[in-house]
Amino acid sequence: MPYPEIMIRPFREDLTRIGVEELRTPEAVDDAVKNTSGTLMIVVNSVCGCAAGKARPGIALALGNEIKPDRVTTVFAGADIEATDRARSYFTGYGPSSPSIGILKDGELVYMMERYQIEGRGPEQIANELTQAFDKFCAPATMAAV
C-alpha cells in the first residue's frame, strides 16, 4: 500500500521546488530515458531520515554546480511504486535502494549512489561526490577533454 500523499507531499516538494521533475508512471520513466539526449539523473526519493537530512539537501547543493545533468528527475519509493520499479530497472547491476541516485548517459547507467553511500555522509559530502560525477559524466565533450 502506497504512503498517503498528504504525508509525503513535503518530501516530494523538497526536490520539485528546486526544479527536479517528478516521474509518476512507468511510461514517464521510459519516456525520460528514451527522450533525453545526454545525461539524465534519476533520484529515488523516500521517507527515510537519510533522504530528508542527507540526500535531498545534498542534491540541492550539487545542483548549484555549473555542470549538471541535462535533465534531473525523481521517483518516490513507496508511493509511485510502478514508476520506481521501472526506474530501478535501468540501474543495471544494482539492487533496490532508497534513497539512491543514478545518472544515465544516452540511456546507459554511468554512475550510481546507493543508500549505504548516503547514510554515513552529510549533505556537503554527498554534494561533493555528485558534483564530481557531474563534472565527469555531464560536461560537454569539449570541456571533458580539457
Where are these regions (language model features)?
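Local sequence-structure signature of Cys/Sec-based thiol-disulfide redox active-site neighborhoods
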Residues: 31-66
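Non-catalytic, surface beta->alpha helical segment in thiol-disulfide oxidoreductase systems
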Residues: 94-142
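N-terminal leader/targeting and pre-domain segments
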Residues: 1-37, 138-143
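Short, well-ordered amphipathic alpha-helices
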Residues: 58-60, 88, 134
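Short acidic (Asp/Glu) patches
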Residues: 84-98
